[in-house]
Every structure is written in C-alpha cells, then in structure tokens.
A protein has these predicted regions:
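Short, basic/aromatic-enriched C-terminal tail that caps enzymatic domains
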Residues: 146-164
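Acidic, His/Gly-enriched loop-helix segments that form or flank divalent-metal centers
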Residues: 12-17, 22-135, 139-145, 156
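Short, small-residue-biased leader/transition segments that mark boundaries at the very start
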Residues: 1-5
C-alpha cells in the first residue's frame, strides 16, 4: 500500500514531527533509505514484512533469569504498569534512566543509547551493566564505537570494532 500526502496528513505535521524526521535522517536515515531503494521490489516487500513482524518489546527467560528486551527504554515508567500499556514513543525513543532500577526480579536490556553517552560510565563503548539494566548499544556508528553482543546464557560479552 502506497502512503500519500493529503491535505489532512499535511495538517497533522507539526514542528516536533519535522524535528524527529530530521534527526532520523541525520542519524542514518538517508543512507538507509538510499540502500532500501537500491533493492528490488520483492526484496523491499520482504524487508517491510520482516520489520512489520517486530515486537515493541519481548520478555524472555534464560537459565531462570528474566529479561525485558526493548529498543530504547521504558518512558513514563511505573512499577506496576504492564508492558503492553506503554506507548510506542516510550519504548523506541525514550532513553533509559541508567540510575534507576526498573525491576528487582528481571533485567531490562536496551539499545538506542550508545554507552559512550551514558553519564559516569566507566567503560564507554562497551556493554554497560548497572541497576538490573544492561545497555548493549556500543556505538558502532560512532568513531571509536563497536558492535557489542551479550550471550545471555553466561553473560559473556563479545565485540567487533567498527571500521572507520
């Protein structure tokens, strides 16, 4: 289905939406769009179908340990709030509060915020663990960043340095 700009949709565009679009473009959106357009129509459909199947969050258990997997954070967090009640923006844009322990009985694993941007982080650019929170975005898209991977079975960390 093709999305079209209509009078109604133009009226819904506000300054905040424009700023978010510009930020997305500056943070890899332009190159992502360019690469997407190089794909065949069939591949584009497969990519859209694949992304459409993504969940906003997941709750898993590995070796008896519970984890909440979420892209960004838990914006507007309340301890008794069910995960399905969070807004899209809360899960994909709101940065986590690394000084807060969201849950005492499970770990929250986030991406979105490169660990070199976490205040008072003793290991910028590496997986960050504090307060039952694990931040795994090691800034691969930044100079000096890397791709980080955490094996949940034994919490071993793996890294690949980014190419500059």
């Amino acid at each position: 289905r093709q999305m079209c700009i209509r009078d109604r949709s133009i009226a819904e565009i506000d300054e905040e939406m424009i700023q978010k679009l510009l930020s997305w473009q500056q943070n890899g959106g332009i190159s992502t769009t360019d690469e997407f357009h190089k794909c065949s129509r069939e591949m584009q459909r497969e990519i859209v179908d694949f992304i459409s199947d993504f969940e906003l969050y997941d709750e898993i258990e590995v070796n008896g340990q519970k984890f909440v997997l979420v892209h960004a954070g838990l914006g507007n967090f309340m301890p008794n709030k069910e995960l399905w009640k969070y807004e899209l923006n809360d899960l994909i844009w709101e940065r986590p509060d690394c000084e807060k322990c969201y849950y005492s009985d499970k770990f929250v694993i986030t991406g979105h915020t490169p660990t070199m941007l976490i205040e008072n982080n003793p290991r910028p650019g590496y997986i960050y663990k504090k307060n039952n929170h694990i931040a795994i975005d090691c800034g691969c898209g930044f100079r000096g960043g890397r791709l980080g991977c955490l094996r949940l079975e034994d919490m071993e960390e793996f890294y690949v340095d980014s190419e500059e």
